[in-house]
Amino acid sequence: MRSLKQKKYRKKYRNFVVEGVRSIRSAFEDRAQFESIFFRDNFDTERIPQLKQVDRNIIYRVSDNTMKKLSNTSAPSGILAVSKLPEYKQFCPDENAIYLDGISDPGNMGTIIRTASWFGVQQVILSKECID
């Protein structure tokens, strides 16, 4: 799982890490295919009701120390998951789209995608130089 911090391994294994309550809730809403879900011993699973629908074989309760090792953040929220990369649909010239080039900050990318979604943009196309 640690290798998924690098873009080449995310591409190779077709997996990525989703971290935090809000992001995992959103992934559930988007019908993400989870490979594994990790949460700290003291994490309140009621915060994400969809966890009740997940195969118990992919859910792992871990110590704070293990969560810190798995997390990409300095202050882990207590839950993270490994999910399959979604299949991208073919470009459709009849739908509105934006093209992004050279976006390297994950926070900026998220803001742009959320804003585009709010404006009804249906396709986001990324250059190879963009963060994935």
Show where each model-derived region lies.
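Glycine/small-residue-rich loop that forms an oxyanion/phosphate-binding "nest" at active or ligand-binding sites
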Residues: 52-84
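A short, well-structured juxtamembrane/interface segment
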Residues: 21, 87-89
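Short connector loops at helix/strand junctions that flank enzyme active sites
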Residues: 32, 74-76, 93-95
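Glycine/charged-rich beta-loop-alpha catalytic/anionic-binding loops adjacent to active sites
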Residues: 7, 61-62, 93-98
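Structural motif
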Residues: 17, 38, 80-82, 99, ...
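Boundary-proximal intrinsically disordered activation/regulatory segments immediately upstream
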Residues: 1-47, 130-132
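Residue-level signal for inorganic ion chemistry
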Residues: 20, 81, 116
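RNA substrate-binding interface of SAM-dependent RNA methyltransferases
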Residues: 29, 91-132
